[in-house]
Amino acid sequence: MKAVKQKSKGGRPPLDKAGDVERRLLDAALQLFLERGFEDTSCEDIARLAGAGKASLYARYANKDAIFEAVVRRDVDTQPLPAAASVPLDLEGRLRHAGQGILAHALQPQTVAMMRLVVGTSIRAPALAAEVNRIGWEGGLRRVQMTILDGPDQPANPSALASHFVDLVFAPHQLRALLGEHPDDLIATASARVEWALALLKDAGQLETGSPQ
């Protein structure tokens, strides 16, 4: 007698599959947001492309805004840390290394496209755009803070130094990328941007360190 194969009843996926559903939903959302823009993408489109039911989508994300935030947060959280330097670096060297890594990621075509998407949502949904921008900015800030703390030579105010460094290094190149300047030109000037920022911070006394503890 042949065993009768039970049909899936749908509903919530097993725990070992839940992460895969989330990944597919965010992959689909990213693809559609970049192809169509935020306004012309619906939650139904995302669920369909992901091969998931609308119930699965809404069980995880309240609305399209929440999906958009999750897409950006995943990009920030999965951004690789700068490769470890081959030799120990002083504070200035660590910041130089981190700054080059931040700009390398920021100038990638998909990153620039995501930034343009955020700008495009700012008129209709300024609160959403502000929140998404905060997520991205804080992600870069955390990486710089980790870089600063990864050594015995510590500045008087690591948090302030990290914030000023991110603003000086990232914001100008971000604006130029959004305005359509060729990525190759921006990449070619990335090192000079980092050196300019370090020079300003040094002149302001923010790179001065105390004795190792």
State what each model feature region is.
Residues M1-A52, D65-A66:
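Basic, helix-initiating cap at the start of DNA-binding domains
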Residues M1-R12, R142, M146, D150, ...:
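C-terminal peripheral helix-coil segments that are non-catalytic and often amphipathic
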Residues A55:
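Key DNA-contact positions within bacterial/archaeal DNA-binding proteins
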Residues K64, V71, D75, L95, ...:
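Hydrophobic/aromatic residues within well-ordered alpha-helical segments
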Residues E69-G99, A106:
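Amphipathic alpha-helical linker/stalk segments
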Residues G93, V112-A113, P126-D153, S163, ...:
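Amphipathic alpha-helical packing segments from all-alpha helical-bundle domains
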Residues A106-R134, A177-G180:
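Amphipathic alpha-helical segments used for helix-helix packing
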